[in-house]
């Protein structure tokens, strides 16, 4: 049957990508339908019970800055919070949280069920409605046809998923859930380039059978307890609990090696490539043969369950081998496994077939987000989902697509990497992937993106008001520090030395003094009995005041580095956004090698910047493209001229 209501946007899948996509489109005022095979699994954490980490936490902050749900849901469900790399520079500091699976999922579902313009429907999708070269809807397993002006696919590991435990395997999207076999077949009919990847998960352990007395506790940060969202508060957090640490040993490794002849990875049963930076335990033992021990973190799955997640023991070995390797580790000698570990193979679709908006180049109105694009991780999925939802909404509204630049957001780095370079293994975000990471910090994600989010329609009034209060406070106090001057007459050496290490010899602004190593905003404000402190607190809420202080201190201390990076962005960006026509005939560009012509024709980059990052495209080739565009050929279709270009 044809459903009687036509929607603006349909989102297929209710994981981390799908939920953010649906919420974003609905916040923009689009009539949105989220189709999921099971409403009870909306927002489910399929693998590890944690959010964030290096690079990943940055993405979560960006999703939050654009009004997304992940950070606030983590604040409501987080049972341990830590700042990683806290002793290092601000660019690589990252928030990580352990989450109670039940509380996190409940927080996401609550937002979905109470979001205006968003409807939910429980049915697996088996087909897409395509008319000409455009998608116009989706068909569920019982034949219900839903029509829409845009469709966002966020199918995760469900597309033709196959689960492996030892040499046994069966179809499934994840343990306990069916695979999306028909939908995968339909996408293949559309001739979209695709491949196979794999990921895995460890066995889960009954905490009642763990001997914690011999294990090392790893508590979270307690003074202060971090929050994830820019709107987060510590009183949102449930009870905080520790993780625990154990280690593999030579016996563990011997057990694994002896079982490799029954491993689907090492017997050729699994064809998909797994994530390099989250390897299975058998892969670790093989790749790092010289190491006699690996650290394993025992992470609680929640406050109302005894289930523990042994982070670092992802495996698809046979169950008897899993049991032996778990029992070989200290504190786990008598552990009971609640769920076996497994590997899962699934289809992904080459992200080089997507525009920067995450819309398919081949099928109009069809957007892809999450693991279907070859990424791994909740955070990468959520960020893509948010962007796909925004761009689906913009398309419905007849507006131009939006994608952040590489110098503007980790989300921009993620998308640009995917659409220009593609993937040969599951893609994970790291701070090292960003050229401009000093400007792309967790602490300033709101300063980078919230105003854009407001213009796009995904940032509500409460977030916008909070952002403006923070931005104004940072600006006001920064200007005060720059305009408040001290000299030796009013700041004697005896008062200066405890804070500055020595007396001052000339006039300085407070901002000048704050730039010095080991001088903090707090110590500066305490100088001479608080003489230089602001008349009023930076904010009424202590947490907000701390965020403002951090922004001020980083902005002043790293001003020179950030300014140099901004100059580099401007220099490199002169031709970054110069458009390349969709029907560009690269054979007409004199001097381009056949290899370069073929690669450009295959990838169809939208801009000079994208073209420059395709493997094998040399700076000389980019120069030839620019010369060709400046000549105004291609039947009058040229990219926008940069400043100073001839007419």
From Swiss-Prot:
NAD(+) binds at residues 274-288. GO terms for cellular component: cytosol. SUPFAM superfamilies: FAD/NAD(P)-binding domain (SSF51905). One of its GO terms (biological process) is tRNA wobble uridine modification. Its main location: cytoplasm. Pfam families: GIDA, GIDA_C_1st, SAM_GIDA_C. It comes from the Bacteria. It is found in: Cytoplasm. NAD-binding protein involved in the addition of a carboxymethylaminomethyl (cmnm) group at the wobble position (U34) of certain tRNAs, forming tRNA-cmnm(5)s(2)U34. Belongs to the MnmG family. This is tRNA uridine 5-carboxymethylaminomethyl modification enzyme MnmG. It comes from Ralstonia nicotianae (strain ATCC BAA-1114 / GMI1000) (Ralstonia solanacearum).
